[in-house]
Regions:
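Glycine-rich beta-alpha junction loops
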Residues: 31-32, 109, 126-127, 178-183, ...
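Metabolite-binding pocket within alpha/beta catalytic cores that recognizes anionic/polar moieties
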Residues: 2-151
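Short, flexible loop segments at the rims of nucleotide/cofactor-binding pockets, characterized by
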Residues: 78-83, 180-183, 200-201
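A C-terminal functional module that forms or caps the active site or interfaces directly
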Residues: 187-235
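Active-site rim beta-loop-alpha module in soluble metabolic enzymes
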Residues: 153-197
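His/Asp/Glu-rich mid-to-C-terminal helical/loop segments that flank catalytic regions of hydrolases
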Residues: 233-301
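Generic secondary-structure signature for well-ordered alpha-helical cores
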Residues: 99, 125-127, 131, 163-171, ...
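Short, hinge-like loop/turn segments at secondary-structure boundaries
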Residues: 119-124, 221-224, 240-243
Length: 301
């Protein structure tokens, strides 16, 4: 329980897991990871929280024999936009499930020169450009004012485990980087990307905040394993990492259906091309991401 939050606010987790099945790690899947391949003995449970509904049911199971719980951040049909995600409910429900740590898997747009499509990266810093989101559990007149130390938003030990896991399976990855969290759901302008680069951002995403801060409020170690989907707007494509192919078209990760919706349901040839390129980058990166994730989970058991 968090100091200052009344016991009456404690959520009820439907059919709560037994101690034997209590998950060691909570895995949050983003764009490109709507389901967790390799998850065995899967059973889903609906979580109820004082903060409302989660993005979907929690998927309990075993990954490489280790009990874990998985939650698709955008919903299992990728139906929830970044600014509409109930981050408080998601993080709270995973904590109540009994996890010891959270690993967030995300797709990002690369700004730094070495963050090419298909590259994996473990960021170490965040700049928050979001607004209007529910950013804290300590909100309202009946709650105390709490200032968490957020100097280093990602847990150092958990980051090290992810990096060591990549080394153990022979998977190259970038071991640091500043994640710029934009509001979305639109993509960034070329001028904005220039600004983000001047600010020190190495990559762009839309979901790290307030997710990382909420995990810190609950004393949950939190780290991210991200896959670069493509280069941010206005930046040269450069060669793709690994087998991702040429996927450097400006813009960032957007599911095919979202591109169509943004254009009133009609897609032109360029949008089709963008969706295919992003899909190719993520298709190439996801097996490598899952390899690293699985190894990290076994190290945390």
């Amino acid at each position: 329980m968090i100091d200052g939050i009344d016991d009456s606010m404690a959520p009820a987790l439907a059919a709560a897991s037994t101690p034997v099945d209590r998950p060691v790690v909570g895995i949050i899947g983003g764009s490109g990871l709507l389901n967790l391949a390799g998850l065995e003995d899967v059973h889903r449970k609906v979580a109820r929280t004082p903060w409302g509904q989660t993005s979907g049911a929690l998927s309990f199971g075993r990954l490489a024999g280790v009990p874990v719980v998985f939650l698709a951040r955008h919903g299992y049909g990728h139906t929830i936009a970044p600014h509409d995600i109930n981050y408080r409910a998601n993080v709270w429900a995973l904590r109540e499930a009994g996890v010891k740590a959270l690993i967030a898997c995300s797709a990002v747009g690369g700004i730094r020169d070495d963050l090419l499509p298909g590259t994996l990266v473990v960021p170490d810093q965040i700049i928050d450009y979001t607004w209007g989101r529910a950013v804290s559990y300590f909100s309202g007149e009946d709650q105390p004012v709490v200032h968490i130390d957020f100097s280093h938003p990602y847990d150092a030990t958990l980051r090290r485990r992810l990096i060591e896991a990549a080394q153990a399976v022979g998977q190259p990855l970038a071991t640091d980087g500043c994640y710029g969290c934009t509001q979305g759901p639109r993509l960034e302008t070329v001028a904005e990307v220039r600004r983000y680069r001047r600010d020190g951002c190495d990559m762009l995403g839309m979901t790290a905040m307030p997710e990382a801060a909420l995990a810190r409020e609950l004393d949950l170690p939190y780290a991210m394993l991200a896959a670069v989907a493509n280069r941010a707007a206005g930046l040269p494509a450069g060669p793709a990492a690994g087998d991702a192919g040429q996927v450097g078209r400006p813009g960032r990760i957007v599911p095919d259906v979202a591109i169509a919706q943004a254009n009133g349901g009609a897609k032109d040839e360029a949008q089709d091309d963008l969706a295919l390129q992003i899909s190719a980058a993520l298709s190439a990166a996801m097996p490598n991401l899952l390899k690293v994730l699985t190894r990290a989970v076994t190290q945390l058991a």
